[in-house]
């Protein structure tokens, strides 16, 4: 038997089993990387996403080569042609691949006509394997993230004081998520100058015109494990102490606040979840950092991220087509060009995404996702857009975050109520409304904020469905304060808004 290893573009780690199991034999084992331009044509990806993935692949391939692995790097239109050639040239009889996290890619590999056995090895890049998550989920009546997170804290003994949570509580969000104060002094994100490999990828993407979405330069992301570790160290040193307090705040021109910016690297395999959690927990003990920030951050990586991955595998393929509210509006043109909206919150957030391929969680959930939800945009259209636009997007993390959390299209598998809000929330958590063409307090009239008329129209339209959720009753009781006449005006503003939209 001759073994060959195919390294996938989102598993750039020597810890994956195909590499760690064969370490002692590395000089004899052929390893292949494939950049397929056909695959990336499926989505109009942000150009910085393409640069990140291909540059990180090229760097990782060079590192393996320097470590004496027998590396082949192919740039091709598809996957099958270079694979077949390489398998034949090296007489490979068993192709080892880390099981792809994304279902569509797993299906694609299984459909390839290859003249050898394919051995999928377990993906060890999460704290909970998908089988462990499914066992946990099958043992529960309800799938609450908070229950899962507590189970993880106990299982991996993180922030524990014996059998009790450190400080006596599991969750310190009461001290987190404050509105932004004026003149906050935020840390600048750590940036990296493109090296020769990255510059070559940038030039090639410009030349080949794989996508025209998003600014390609300046490109400041890390592209190697070593650089990603610097991002983690910088976060722990400079941002972690304040992370929790302003986790949900949004400020004009402040793209990253105290957020970690580690998701692109975690999702590519350049960082491991356990090393992040350990670095943060160690800093807590060594520097006596505020527990609200430390616990709040660990909950993101150990709770939310693992939970989203688990739910993706717990659900079947049909999850991606969920549409509980039966929303079918198309994607407005301004999602592809921020200059085409005069709603300041959307304009600021979409401009930022165009410039960096990044937005923090509340910008994604409460500005972009919230707008799509209350305006009635198709969950699949908005999911496609998120998948194209964000630097850290992959199918497993998109389905759960966009279809489930953002759009509530799964009818409550993942969240107990929809994340829907009016301008009131955006005004409280940001400074966007102060500079907007619209009036944040109006839900009718010439300057009515679209977040307001869409919000009330959403509640009114889906009143019966929302009633069944129980947790929406208080919100729904406010509908009584609005007269039928006013609802007529609200719904005509919503209809008029759609009539005036250019569709992308
Ligand atoms: P921080 O705020 O510093 O958080 C730390 C880490 O926690 C993140 O890096 C991430 O690894 C993890 N995390 C926190 N929440 C989640 C979550 N809900 N799901 C998965 N991981 C989480 N995350 C992605 O990795 N890729 C995506 O494409 C993506 N799309 C999203 C779309 C929507 C509509 C929403 C609501 C959330 C999405 N998220 C996605 C989750 C979250 O917003 C990002 O992980 C986070 O903003 C990344 O920035 P950061 O590294 O600075 O995160
Ligand atoms: Fe957004 Fe409305 Fe505030 Fe303008 S007024 S920034 S549209 S929420």
In which residue ranges do the predicted regions lie?
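N-terminal beta-strand-loop-alpha-helix module at the start
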Residues: 1-74
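Short His-Asn-centered micro-motif
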Residues: 6-10, 34-35, 74-77, 97-100, ...
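C-terminal catalytic domain of photolyase/cryptochrome flavoproteins
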Residues: 8-12, 249, 253-263, 268-504
């Amino acid at each position: 038997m001759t073994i060959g290893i195919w390294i996938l573009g989102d598993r750039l780690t020597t810890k994956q089993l195909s590499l760690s199991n064969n370490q002692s034999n590395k000089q004899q084992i052929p390893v292949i990387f494939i950049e397929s331009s056909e695959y990336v044509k499926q989505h109009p990806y942000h150009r910085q996403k393409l640069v990140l993935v291909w540059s990180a692949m090229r760097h990782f391939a060079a590192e393996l080569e320097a470590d004496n692995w027998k590396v082949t790097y192919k740039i091709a239109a598809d996957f099958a042609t270079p694979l077949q050639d390489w398998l034949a040239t090296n007489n490979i009889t068993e192709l080892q691949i880390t099981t792809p996290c994304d279902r569509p890619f797993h299906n694609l590999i299984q459909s390839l006509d290859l003249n050898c056995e394919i051995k999928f090895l377990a993906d060890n890049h999460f704290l909970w394997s998908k089988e462990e998550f499914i066992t946990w989920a099958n043992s529960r009546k309800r799938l609450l993230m908070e229950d899962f997170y507590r189970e993880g804290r106990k299982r991996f003994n993180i922030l524990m004081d014996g059998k009790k949570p450190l400080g006596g509580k599991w969750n310190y969000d009461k001290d987190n998520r404050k509105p932004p104060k004026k003149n906050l002094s935020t840390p600048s994100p750590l940036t990296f100058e493109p090296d020769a490999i990255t510059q070559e990828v940038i030039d090639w993407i410009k030349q080949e015109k794989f996508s025209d979405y998003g600014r390609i330069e300046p490109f400041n992301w890390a592209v190697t494990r070593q650089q990603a570790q610097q991002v983690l160290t910088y976060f722990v040193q400079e941002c972690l102490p304040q992370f929790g307090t302003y986790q949900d705040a949004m400020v004009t021109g402040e793209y990253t606040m105290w957020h970690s910016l580690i998701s692109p690297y975690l999702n590519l395999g350049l960082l491991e979840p356990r090393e992040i959690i350990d670095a943060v927990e160690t800093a807590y003990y060594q520097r006596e950092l505020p527990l609200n920030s430390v616990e709040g951050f660990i909950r993101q990586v150990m709770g939310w991220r693992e939970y989203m991955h688990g739910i993706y595998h717990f659900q079947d393929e049909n999850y991606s087509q969920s549409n509980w509210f039966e929303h079918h509006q198309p994607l407005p043109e301004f999602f592809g060009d921020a200059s085409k909206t005069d709603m300041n919150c959307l304009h600021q957030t979409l401009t930022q995404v165009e410039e960096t391929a990044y937005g923090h969680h509340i910008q994604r959930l409460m500005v972009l996702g919230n707008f799509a939800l209350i305006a009635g945009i198709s969950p699949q259209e908005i999911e496609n857009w998120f998948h194209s636009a964000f630097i850290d997007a992959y199918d497993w993390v998109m389905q759960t975050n966009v279809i489930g959390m953002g759009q509530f299209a799964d009818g409550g598998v993942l969240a107990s109520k929809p994340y829907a809000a009016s301008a009131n929330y955006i005004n409280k958590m940001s400074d966007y409304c102060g500079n907007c063409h619209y009036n944040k307090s109006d839900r009718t009239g010439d300057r009515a904020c679209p977040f307001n008329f869409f919000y009330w129209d959403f509640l009114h339209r889906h009143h019966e469905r929302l009633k069944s959720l129980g947790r929406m009753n208080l919100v729904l009781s406010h509908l009584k304060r609005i007269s039928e006449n006013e609802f007529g005006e609200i719904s005509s503003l919503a209809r008029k808004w759609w009539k005036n939209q250019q569709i992308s």
